[in-house]
Regions:
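Conserved class I S-adenosyl-L-methionine
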Residues: 2-44
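Helix-to-beta-strand junctions that scaffold the AdoMet/dcAdoMet cofactor pocket
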Residues: 44, 120-121, 135-137
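Class I SAM-dependent methyltransferase SAM/SAH-binding core
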Residues: 50, 56-100
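A conserved beta-strand element that flanks and buttresses the S-adenosyl-L-methionine
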Residues: 111-112
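A short glycine-rich, Lys/Arg-flanked "PGG" loop and its adjoining helix->strand segment in the class I
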Residues: 125-137
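Conserved beta-strand signature within the Rossmann-like core of class I S-adenosyl-L-methionine
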Residues: 138-145
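Acceptor-substrate binding/catalytic loop of class I
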Residues: 153-170
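Core SAM-dependent methyltransferase catalytic element
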Residues: 187-203
């Protein structure tokens, strides 16, 4: 049996393999809307947003664009990026790993929804420096995690799908270390399909 570390390395290939099927499965229902509205309430109108793990751009990026914002989306899957480019050709789409992507600009908001939690714990810790690098004062940051420290396996069309989380206390320490204040955090949000969501703002 493959160990979890090896499975974590398969995430990029799994999403490439199942990009179109995942898009159909995800659908257009925006169960995240309440969180996205709170996220957007923290930033100016017509802001530039960074979406890490953007997928095909639907439905989340679509909603952000509809609210008048400009988007740069990053995804490791070339298929996902091609779909996003086709869906929203006026936005900027970058095929890259969120852990190593290099962008010479900063953003009013950073989103890592259903993407950050596929990273192994050490990579998650290192991402907070990346979040800070792309931030300015008052940048909003929102990401999803697990409700507690640990690793878990899901399933995507028969392939094992790796997830990991740090503890809530460690996330709070890292956010504070990199200059973010927690605005709201809900574990296993029943109004958002059980997601554990963090919303913070750069000071």
């Amino acid at each position: 049996m493959e160990n979890q570390s090896a499975l974590a390395q398969n995430i990029i290939e799994i999403y490439k393999k199942h990009a179109r099927a995942w898009t159909e499965l995800r659908g257009d229902f925006l169960y995240e809307k309440e969180w996205l509205d709170l996220f957007l309430s923290l930033i100016p109108v017509h802001s530039t947003l960074l979406d890490l793990g953007c997928g095909p751009g639907k439905p989340i990026a679509d909603y952000l664009i509809q609210q008048g914002h400009t988007l740069i989306g990053v995804d490791s899957s070339d298929v996902m990026i091609a779909m996003a480019q086709k869906n929203f050709p006026k936005q900027t789409w970058v095929q890259a790993d969120m852990r190593t992507v290099e962008l010479d600009q900063k953003f009013n908001a950073i989103l890592a929804w259903d993407s950050f939690f596929h990273l192994i714990p050490d990579d998650q810790r290192q991402m907070f420096a990346q979040f800070a690098q792309f931030s300015v004062t008052n940048t909003a940051l929102m990401f999803t995690s697990g409700p507690m420290a640990g690793e878990a396996m899901g399933d995507l069309f028969g392939d094992a799908l790796y997830h990991a989380s740090l503890s809530q206390d460690e996330y709070r320490v890292l956010l504070k270390q990199y200059g973010f204040n927690v605005v709201k955090m809900v574990a296993n949000d029943v109004e958002c399909t059980g997601h554990t969501v963090w919303l913070a703002q750069k000071q």
